[in-house]
Amino acid sequence: MSHLPPAIFLMGPTASGKTDLALELARVLPCELISVDSALVYRGMDIGTAKPAKALLAEFPHRLIDIRDPAESYSAAEFRDDALAAMAEISARGRIPLLVGGTMLYYKALLEGLADMPSADPALRAELEARGAAEGWAALHRELATVDPESAARIHPNDPQRLVRALEVYRVSGLSMTAHRLRQVAQNPLSDRSAGEHLPYTVVHLAIAPTQRQILHERIARRFRLMLEQGFVDEVELLWRRGDLHASLPSMRAVGYRQVWEYLDGLLTREQMVERGIIATRQLAKRQFTWLRNWTDLHWLDSLGDDNLQRTLKYLETAAILA
């Protein structure tokens, strides 16, 4: 058995049932929850992020939820620092960190560390975002392919946040993200390892999703419409009326929030907002699946399984996570 303390990653696409399973595990295991979700960090963004209810958060506290105002940014590097601190504190008390969420870049940052990259340039970022809105993101993707084909191959044309960051790195430094990573590997060969040497834990990797993609699509559509019934538009309108927020902020680029914001701006009808919100959520799920397909040592669970808790506990025992 490894001498490293244990940790559990519970991953999966949006609307797959990650949170429900995590809460079941928290009821029976000596574990504490850490959110791995780039939207749940924001206060006042509850309905559209499917944030656990306040009563559940009181019973089962989640680290890294409600830690930023929507006007602020939150990077993968900040997440890594915060998550490592939370994991160390949980482990020091003899308990198991259970990380749950679908922001796959955050998991990757934890496992592999992050290459040193230039700081953000707000003016340049605003320029690139304006170009993407005017010319279409496919145009920026083609531009990225000319200066950093490796990153372009990894980044989907419908992923504006990563597109903008990759182009920003090149414009600021004159080096592509790929070149930065290669330079870091040359300086420290261990930085290219992907088996978790940067994370001093014995990690069990779990993923949950329906076995049929159509079932996930139906769950996504049903959940988005339920969010609207629960007051999602009113939630976004409170943010929209603040006056200090805008559509280009990372918080307002979150799936669903962008579409409702455009509806409030009069750019979409309600019907268009609903349709585009559902499509954007499906595209997010597709990107999450792409990450997960390339993940190693991943134990899959079926969202519709009626014995996921027992199956997970049995797997954790087999993996020697449970004493």
Curated annotation (Swiss-Prot):
Residues that hold substrate according to the record: 14-19
A Gene Ontology molecular function term of the record: ATP binding
Keywords assigned: ATP-binding, Magnesium, Nucleotide-binding, Transferase, tRNA processing
InterPro entries: Dimethylallyltransferase, IPT, P-loop_NTPase
Positions annotated to bind ATP: 12-19
Protein's GO biological process: tRNA modification
Catalyzed reactions per annotation: adenosine(37) in tRNA + dimethylallyl diphosphate = N(6)-dimethylallyladenosine(37) in tRNA + diphosphate
Cofactor section: Mg(2+)
Region annotation Interaction with substrate tRNA: where it falls in the sequence: 37-40, 161-165
Enzyme Commission (EC) number: 2.5.1.75
Site positions (Interaction with substrate tRNA): 103, 125
Family note: Belongs to the IPP transferase family.
Subunit organization: Monomer.
Annotated function: Catalyzes the transfer of a dimethylallyl group onto the adenine at position 37 in tRNAs that read codons beginning with uridine, leading to the formation of N6-(dimethylallyl)adenosine (i(6)A).
Protein name (record): tRNA dimethylallyltransferase
Native species: Azotobacter vinelandii (strain DJ / ATCC BAA-1303)
